[in-house]
From Swiss-Prot:
GO molecular function: metal ion binding; metallopeptidase activity
Cross-referenced PANTHER family: DNA REPAIR PROTEIN RADC, UPF0758 PROTEIN YEES-RELATED
Source organism per UniProt: Rhodopseudomonas palustris (strain HaA2)
Record family assignment: Belongs to the UPF0758 family.
InterPro entries according to UniProt: MPN (IPR037518), RadC_JAB (IPR025657), RuvA_2-like (IPR010994), UPF0758 (IPR001405), UPF0758_CS (IPR020891), UPF0758_N (IPR046778)
Record: residues binding Zn(2+): 199, 201, 212
A GO biological process held by the record: proteolysis
Entry protein name: UPF0758 protein RPB_0700
Amino acid sequence: MVDPISNAAPPMPADSSERLDPPGFAEAPHYHGHRERLRERFREAGAAALSDYELLELVLFRALPRRDVKPLAKALIARFGSFAETMQAPEPRLREVSGLGEAAITEIKLVAAAAARVTKGQVKSRTVLSSWSAVIDYCRTTMAFADREQFRILFLDKRNQLIADELQQVGTVDHTPVYPREIVKRALELSATAVIMVHNHPSGDPTPSQADIQMTKTIVAIAEPLGVAVHDHIIVGKNGHASLKGLKLF
């Protein structure tokens, strides 16, 4: 038997939290307005108007479209220290953060890769010694926040333009093995007439050690008789950079 259709209105929910919205009029999550306001601030005033966690929120929006990402962004900054350090954090450490999935990690690494590509382009397109600030920016972007020591060589031609940028060695948290004769051999293979050596200090303090100074002098002694100049040895860290040439240490 079919029940008769009642003309009476359906009962209202007893609790207003159970209110039924008409189709097409569902209330937007509270964070949608926040996202639009944050984007608007970025469009109008740029990144300088945003704190580190707010800039990180913008990075996470696309990977996590249905979540309030502010707590996650704040947690990442608290864990790693800054926006830059979060971008450079190793993927295994990022995976330790609760709520940060592979899509979000990919977004973070994409931003880091884009920044490195931009700064490298600024170095490649100019004479290196006439764009020293671009060299420093590139070295800090690619190496300053790494959790292990890295040793990189910029090989230059006779016009001091970049021929090659090669990561030679990756070591431990406080040591990288360096082979001076291999560095000079590689310079000759590339027909480079000069090199700039770069390595990082994961501790954040770029102060040269005695081992750094001695290794630099050894490379200079091998390279110069073969026509390869050592323009500088730069050490980068979270807290700045040091130029052994500028400090007159070789």
